[in-house]
């Protein structure tokens, strides 16, 4: 089941940074903002994969091999409509 609030919080956190966020840092920021320390990795991954499929976020690997997430221009435009 989609969690639109979780998706919006992910987009808002990614919009605040220029270079993207490591996956664990993003998940921690989302947990804090939503006040949900019980957020599961599966819930988070479902939401971020949905956003990636829609072209709102992109995933890349930094030089030390960590997964980093960033927001696309389409993602920024989607946030303007909220």
Where are these regions (language model features)?
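Short alpha-helical segments that sit at the start of domains
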Residues: 1-20
């Amino acid at each position: 089941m989609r969690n639109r609030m979780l998706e919006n919080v992910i987009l808002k956190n990614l919009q605040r940074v220029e270079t993207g966020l490591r996956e664990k840092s993003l998940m921690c920021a989302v947990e804090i903002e939503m006040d949900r320390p019980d957020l599961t990795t599966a819930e988070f991954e479902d939401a971020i994969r949905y956003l990636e499929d829609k072209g709102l976020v992109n995933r890349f690997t930094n030089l030390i091999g960590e997964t980093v997430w960033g927001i696309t221009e389409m993602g920024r435009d989607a946030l303007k409509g909220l």
